[in-house]
């Protein structure tokens, strides 16, 4: 699964949030990136098409309703998918051993 850098940044916002978010909230959260509203709309639709984001409901936004979204997969699940695409399956045990060793070092 490949996400563009911008899509990854959008997903980081969702992974860090503790609640479903509407497009307007995403826009306010990433004002420093100077993305256009239409670009964010396109990225949200792309992320849903890729299966990493899902629509979960609606909230009142002014006089209309806005869709709300949440991650369909966790950040860890996404990273596992990326690694699985890049690493041959026969190297998974070595990867897991390296990760466990890293956890042991970090916890000391």
Predicted regions and their residues:
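Short amphipathic alpha-helical interaction segments
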Residues: 34-49
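A short, conserved structural fragment
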Residues: 48-60
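Short alpha-helical segments that sit at the start of domains
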Residues: 1-13, 17, 74, 85-89
């Amino acid at each position: 699964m490949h996400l563009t850098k911008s899509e990854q940044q959008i997903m980081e916002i969702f992974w860090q949030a503790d609640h479903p978010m509407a497009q307007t909230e995403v826009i306010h959260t990433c004002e420093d990136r100077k993305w256009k509203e239409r670009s964010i709309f396109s990225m949200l639709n792309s992320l849903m098409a890729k299966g990493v984001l899902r629509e979960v409901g609606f909230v009142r936004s002014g006089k209309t309703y806005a869709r709300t979204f949440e991650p369909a997969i966790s950040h860890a699940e996404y990273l596992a998918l990326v690694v699985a695409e890049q690493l041959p399956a026969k190297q998974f045990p070595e990867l897991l051993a390296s990760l466990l060793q890293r956890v042991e070092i970090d916890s000391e």
